[in-house]
């Protein structure tokens, strides 16, 4: 696998990977080391960590069901992992998921998509802490997209937009602290 460590799903979202996947592996001595005999991939685009986790679990289950008979009959070819393609997926820190108006709208949306109940995307709204549960990019070329100043939250047509260094993103769901 490309990502090894505590948070591979969140890391692939934060880094903007197009695809991710699962591997059927022999257990090695290190984290996610060992040869693999089967792999399957799926698209990352637009999925949050919970959705991607579920999709990968289903994909892994299907791959295992397909691979087990081949393993039992010794019909698999084992492939050594290319260590040069490996990236460490460190545990997500709370600071990494704090929304930052000086970052791009895309980076902030990725923070929201990579977040979870245990590591939420956070920001300050009217001086109070809040979790941003869902967000999406907006098409700035669209005439309906509002111009929002960096660091400002703005409501247009019943929708909430957060201004960033390169435009804005739409805040779709918020959970205030203590709720």
Regions found by a protein language model. Give the residues of each.
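Donor/substrate-binding cores of folate-linked one-carbon enzymes
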Residues: 1-88
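Weak global preference for isoleucine
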Residues: 9, 13, 24-27, 31, ...
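Short secondary-structure boundary/capping segments
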Residues: 14, 28, 89-91, 122, ...
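Active-site-lining helix/loop region of Rossmann-like oxidoreductase modules
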Residues: 66-125, 131
């Amino acid at each position: 696998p490309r990502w090894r460590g505590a948070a591979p799903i969140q890391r692939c979202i934060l880094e903007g990977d197009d695809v991710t996947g699962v591997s059927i592996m022999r257990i090695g001595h290190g984290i996610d080391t060992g040869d693999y005999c089967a792999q399957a991939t799926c698209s990352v685009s637009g999925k949050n960590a919970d959705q991607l986790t579920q999709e990968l679990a289903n994909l892994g289950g299907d791959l295992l069901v397909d691979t087990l008979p081949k393993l039992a009959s010794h019909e698999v070819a084992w492939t050594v992992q290319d260590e040069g393609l490996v990236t460490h997926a460190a545990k997500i820190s709370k600071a990494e998921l704090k929304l930052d108006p000086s970052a791009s709208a895309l980076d902030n949306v990725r923070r929201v998509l990579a977040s979870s109940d245990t590591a939420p995307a956070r920001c300050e709204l009217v001086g109070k802490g809040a979790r941003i549960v869902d967000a999406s990019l907006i098409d700035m070329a669209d005439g309906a997209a509002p111009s929002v100043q960096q660091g400002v939250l703005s409501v247009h047509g019943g929708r909430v937009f957060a201004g960033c260094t390169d435009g804005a993103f739409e805040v779709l769901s918020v959970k205030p602290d203590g709720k």
